[in-house]
Amino acid sequence: MIRAIVTDIEGTTSDIRFVHNVLFPYARERLAGFVTAQQYAEPVKTILDNLRRETDAPAASTADLITTLFAFMDEDRKSTALKALQGIIWRDGYLNGDFTGHLYPDVLPALEKWKAQGIDLYVYSSGSVAAQKLLFGYSDEGDITHLFTGYFDTLVGAKREVQSYRNIAEHLGHAPGTILFLSDIHQELDAAEAAGLRTIQLVRGDRDPASHHPQVQRFDDIHPEQIPA
């Protein structure tokens, strides 16, 4: 019996184009000015200090760090410091009404159904927990954060590492086989499966021929009650 569902965001609950065509450019345009203006104020000061440790550059200037952050964006590096700064900038965008968090129309009804069935819902994304809460708090469907019991980001580990999913299972307090992980990336699902979790792959476009995981196109194609223990 599935007791908890952990879902990815990008390409799973939300269109990847929203992240890459709206969120990323919005943060990139504002990053340098924001970091320069806030470098001595919290939480930016601590984030920059963490970035110096992350890059093993204790003497790096703010200008150096900004250059590093732009390089990380170009590489799509899953840097905890970068994700934290992006999340702060996106908060202003959500609060100002510059955009709302995209949700596929099949997502909310399924989440509500699973919640009503007594299944705990969690999010695991490379974006910071703060950014996750913003997307679901200011979504196309309004604030749906009440549906989620908890959130995980790269602080629990990278999404293609088996140990990350062991950490999540330990935190949830459920046997791994009672946890279902949803993602559009088969390498993430491979890691989750190796940790003992159940897996389903969301394929919003063409099927993934390199994947052995069950593939569905919509959340309403997922029936956790039919997954054997």
From Swiss-Prot:
Pathway annotation from the record: Amino-acid biosynthesis; L-methionine biosynthesis via salvage pathway; L-methionine from S-methyl-5-thio-alpha-D-ribose 1-phosphate: step 3/6; Amino-acid biosynthesis; L-methionine biosynthesis via salvage pathway; L-methionine from S-methyl-5-thio-alpha-D-ribose 1-phosphate: step 4/6
Coiled-coil positions: none
InterPro entries assigned: Enolase-ppase_E1, HAD-like_sf, HAD-SF_hydro_IA, HAD_sf
GO terms of biological process kind: L-methionine salvage from methylthioadenosine
Keywords, sorted A to Z: Amino-acid biosynthesis, Hydrolase, Magnesium, Metal-binding, Methionine biosynthesis
Single GO MF descriptor: 2,3-diketo-5-methylthiopentyl-1-phosphate enolase activity
Required co-factors: Mg(2+)
E.C. no: 3.1.3.77
Parts of the chain that traverse the membrane: none
Source organism, top-level taxon: Bacteria
Region (Disordered): 207-229
Manner of cofactor binding, per the entry note: Binds 1 Mg(2+) ion per subunit.
Biological role: Bifunctional enzyme that catalyzes the enolization of 2,3-diketo-5-methylthiopentyl-1-phosphate (DK-MTP-1-P) into the intermediate 2-hydroxy-3-keto-5-methylthiopentenyl-1-phosphate (HK-MTPenyl-1-P), which is then dephosphorylated to form the acireductone 1,2-dihydroxy-3-keto-5-methylthiopentene (DHK-MTPene).
Quaternary data: Monomer.
UniProt keyword Hydrolase present: yes
Residue stretches of biased makeup (Basic and acidic residues): 218-229
Family affiliation: Belongs to the HAD-like hydrolase superfamily. MasA/MtnC family.
Catalytic activity: 5-methylsulfanyl-2,3-dioxopentyl phosphate + H2O = 1,2-dihydroxy-5-(methylsulfanyl)pent-1-en-3-one + phosphate
Name assigned to this protein: Enolase-phosphatase E1
Keyword Amino-acid biosynthesis included in the entry's annotation: yes
